[in-house]
A protein has these predicted regions:
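Active-site bordering "gate/hinge" segments
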Residues: 1-216, 314, 318
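Short, glycine-/Ser/Thr-/acidic-enriched flexible segments
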Residues: 35-36, 84-85, 157, 200-202, ...
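Structural motif
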Residues: 154, 197, 223, 306-307
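Charge-rich, low-complexity terminal tails
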Residues: 174, 289-318
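Conserved mixed alpha/beta catalytic, RNA-binding, or beta-rich assembly cores of soluble enzyme
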Residues: 210-219, 235-243
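Active-site and channel-lining beta-strand-loop segments
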Residues: 216-231, 304
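A beta-strand-loop signature enriched in Asp, Gly, Thr, and Trp
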Residues: 228-256
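Cysteine/selenocysteine-centered motifs that mediate thiol-based redox chemistry or coordinate metal-sulfur cofactors
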Residues: 250-303
Length: 318
């Protein structure tokens, strides 16, 4: 756990809220629900002493929300860890302690770190050095910039292909409000083909909670970066996915072509943001147009090629 906490605070140091402080030390508010209390307290306990951070801990389930609001105002950063999607009393607005805090959290979003559904998997999520992840991301982007086309093969005869855009973002735990490291992403405007999707989902729409990590049973057809067909042997899954697609035209658009690069992340079907960093492809649908909801399809396997060069086939080749 100590190494994961050390890696986590390497990301914290690179968060814009800390970079812009221009002074040593920081006052950090750590809040958790009861289910994540042990992990939250381990983060405080194992923080490297050289950072000279001071911590205030609050239990979000029980602490008076007015007191939490005061602590948010006065801190340099707040780190909240809690379960939302996997709770038995799941609510689209989050657990009951969140709505009273929401306006203040929104006001200070630039100093917020939200680790929803991480729990016991915090250790896994931050177990790889961000230096290693950053170097891997740089190599992948450099390889992309030497290529013109991208291909993805699902291993079952299906594939996607498109023209590479050379505008990439790298999430490596440095200088980004999303401090979870392990992703490079771009947009492919002419993505086309048909694939069998197996893996998990990440969205405000709770597909992951209902279906977990699925076998390759969802066939998805894409033309010019829009989902045009879907079918599955699991009729309920097919109906639910169609309902999502038909709810808003923007939900059909492939807004993101992402590659997870955090080698130690596994898929758990928790609707947790760190699962998007699982090695390999994820496609982000929706979220770019008013009324649409972003839905990540995180593939459990497959092969990625830039031009005819294999970049990933279960392991990275760059």
């Amino acid at each position: 756990m100590e190494k994961s906490v050390e890696n986590f605070f390497s990301c914290v140091r690179g968060h814009p809220a800390m970079v812009q402080k221009h002074s040593a030390g920081a006052n950090i508010l750590v809040g958790s629900d009861q289910s994540q209390r042990n992990t939250a307290q381990s983060i405080i306990r194992h923080c490297p002493k050289k950072l000279e951070y001071s911590f205030t801990y609050v239990e979000l389930d029980t602490e008076n929300h007015e007191q939490v609001i005061k602590e948010i105002d006065r801190c340099d950063m707040f780190i909240f860890m809690y379960d939302s999607s996997i709770r038995s009393d799941i609510n689209p607005h989050g657990p009951s302690f969140i709505p009273p805090l929401k306006p203040k959290m929104a006001e200070h979003w630039k100093k917020s770190v939200l680790l929803r559904e991480y729990g016991e998997f915090f250790k896994e999520a931050f177990s790889e050095s961000i230096d290693d992840i950053a170097a891997r991301n740089e190599r992948i982007i450099a390889a992309a910039q030497r290529a013109r086309r991208v291909q993805f093969h699902d291993g079952f005869g299906g594939s996607l292909h498109g023209t590479l855009d050379q505008t990439w973002k790298s999430l490596d735990g440095r200088n980004h409000y999303d401090l979870m490291p392990g992703e490079v992403a771009t947009r492919v405007l002419d993505l086309a083909g048909s694939v069998l999707f197996g893996g998990t989902f990440l969205s405000t729409v709770p597909f992951a909670i209902k279906y977990g990590v699925i076998d390759p049973i969802l066939k998805i057809g894409i033309e010019r970066s829009q989902v045009v067909s879907v079918e599955s042997a699991n009729r309920q899954l097919e109906d639910d996915f169609r309902l999502y697609l038909d709810k808003c035209a923007g939900n059909r658009i492939v807004e993101e072509f992402g590659i997870g690069t955090n080698l130690n992340v596994r898929l758990h079907g928790r609707n947790a943001s760190f699962e998007e960093r699982h090695p390999g492809l994820h496609l982000g649908l929706g979220g770019g147009e008013r009324g649409s909801h972003h839905l990540d399809l995180v593939f459990s396997s497959g092969k990625i090629l830039f031009d005819d060069t294999v970049i990933f086939d279960g392991a990275f080749r760059v």
